[in-house]
């Protein structure tokens, strides 16, 4: 007998080594015939599978490697029945008990009446079965003619599938509950962020009011702004469009004021140029008489508003008239009662004092507008800071959610690994239970 290594029946993964012994059976010559004194021989290959790692015990196995009888006499040899073959095919000195019929296929699992489940391993979502010396996918495997699982095997497999489905449903349910809790936490954080924004705005508004108190207070405007701020705080909303609209209004007011100043300067230069030759031609007026220049308005009893209504200069367009009216109303509102008193006392003042008074009022209005503009810019900066903090909170929530998800996945992987190791140990114990008794217990294979 010469052992030959064979690795063709194991595919790509060499899990075992196969040794082949050539058994030669010699038949006695027939002495009844005097002439026929030849002896006949029959060669039968037997494969013995030895695992590479873990166990050192051989597993004799017969493969369908038998050749067709070479002659009629060889085919007419008596066949050994299966019942005469011993069930124990171990150790190697008992190969005579193995069925040596070359035309007979190896005994299947159903013939031996063994309830044996093949080894199974689950990787991710796929199940692999160890069949015919290799790991095969359970869904794509080919049914071997020597593999015939019993009804109990299918029953166990069905129960395992039901248990896996139940476990998956429980995991999905727990993940949904965790997702719901994270959403609630995110909603609460958003509410807290809004409340903090409101408190910050109130604090900034109070500080701005204390710093930007002009010498001429504006009680009406402050009360209106306070009411607007309170309404916004109750609603817990800080619309950005409103801020943009206020900034745009302030810019338009600044532009209108600049245009008004330019028009007044041009108007005053024209009046001065026209009044210079008139004063040279006319005698010096008495101190009780008021000089009447041709560029001034006829109706002097209307006070300061007369300069904004009907100037004798070139006719201004419709937009300039609208801006002038808006500026007149704004200056009158911001000047308050002092402006009304000055307007009442306006006709009694000389012409040189009226433009100075107007310049003072416009300067006060510009200062108030600049202070409001600064406050709005500071509020805009604080809003940007709060938005950045809100983004940071959102990123932290996202990181926490990802961490929890990774922890769940790690737990699932650990559970699956422990389950696979437990199943492998059970399978190894079953394999050793099917093997015959030995003098020494073999060592268990080391875990990979």
From Swiss-Prot:
Residues 206-226, 270-321 are annotated as: Disordered. The modification Phosphoserine is found at residues 41, 86, 89, 97, 124, 144, 148, 150, 212, 225, 335, 338. It comes from the Eukaryota. Belongs to the chibby family. SPERT subfamily. The keyword Transmembrane does not apply. Residues 163-198, 242-267, 356-414 form a coiled coil. It comes from Macaca fascicularis. Homodimer. Binds to NEK1. Keywords: Coiled coil, Phosphoprotein. Residues 279-291 have a biased composition (Basic and acidic residues). Pfam families: Chibby. This is Protein chibby homolog 2.
């Amino acid at each position: 007998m010469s052992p030959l290594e064979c690795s063709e029946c194991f595919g790509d993964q060499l899990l075992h080594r196969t040794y082949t012994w050539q058994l030669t059976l010699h038949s006695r010559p027939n002495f009844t015939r005097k002439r026929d004194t030849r002896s006949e021989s029959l060669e039968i290959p037997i494969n013995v599978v030895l695992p590479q790692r873990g166990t050192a015990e051989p597993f004799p196995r017969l493969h369908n490697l038998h050749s067709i009888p070479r002659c009629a006499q060889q085919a007419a040899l008596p066949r050994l029945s299966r019942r005469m073959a011993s069930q124990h095919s171990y150790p190697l000195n008992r190969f005579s008990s193995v069925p040596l019929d070359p035309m007979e296929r190896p005994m299947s699992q159903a013939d031996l009446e063994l309830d044996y489940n093949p080894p199974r391993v689950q990787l991710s979502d796929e199940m692999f079965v160890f069949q015919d010396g290799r790991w095969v996918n359970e869904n794509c495997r080919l049914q071997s003619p020597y593999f015939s699982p019993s009804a109990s095997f299918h029953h166990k497999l069905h129960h395992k599938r039901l248990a896996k489905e139940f476990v998956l449903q429980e995991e999905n349910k727990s993940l949904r509950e965790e997702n719901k809790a994270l959403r609630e936490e995110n909603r609460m954080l958003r509410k807290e962020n809004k409340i903090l924004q409101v408190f910050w705005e109130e604090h900034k508004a109070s500080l701005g009011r204390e710093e930007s108190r002009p010498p001429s207070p504006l009680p009406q405007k402050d009360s209106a702004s306070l009411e607007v701020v309170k309404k916004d705080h109750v609603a817990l909303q800080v619309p950005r469009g409103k801020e943009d609209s206020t900034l745009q209004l302030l810019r338009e007011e600044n532009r209108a004021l600049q245009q008004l100043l330019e028009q007044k300067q041009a108007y005053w230069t024209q009046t001065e140029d026209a009044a210079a030759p008139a004063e040279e031609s006319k005698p010096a007026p008495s101190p009780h008489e008021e000089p009447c220049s041709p560029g001034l308005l006829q109706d002097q009893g209307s006070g300061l508003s007369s300069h904004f209504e009907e100037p004798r200069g070139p006719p201004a367009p419709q937009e300039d008239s609208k801006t002038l009216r808006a500026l007149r109303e704004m200056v009158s509102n911001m000047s308050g009662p002092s402006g009304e008193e000055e307007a009442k006392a306006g006709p009694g003042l000389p012409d040189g004092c009226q433009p100075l008074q107007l310049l003072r009022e416009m300067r006060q209005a510009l200062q108030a507008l600049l202070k409001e503009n600064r406050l709005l810019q500071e509020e805009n900066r604080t809003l940007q800071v709060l938005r950045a903090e809100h983004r940071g909170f959102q990123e932290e929530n996202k990181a926490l959610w990802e961490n929890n998800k990774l922890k769940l996945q790690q737990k699932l992987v650990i559970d699956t690994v422990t389950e696979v190791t437990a199943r492998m140990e059970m399978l190894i114990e079953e394999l050793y239970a099917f093997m015959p008794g030995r003098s020494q217990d073999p060592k268990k294979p080391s875990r990979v």
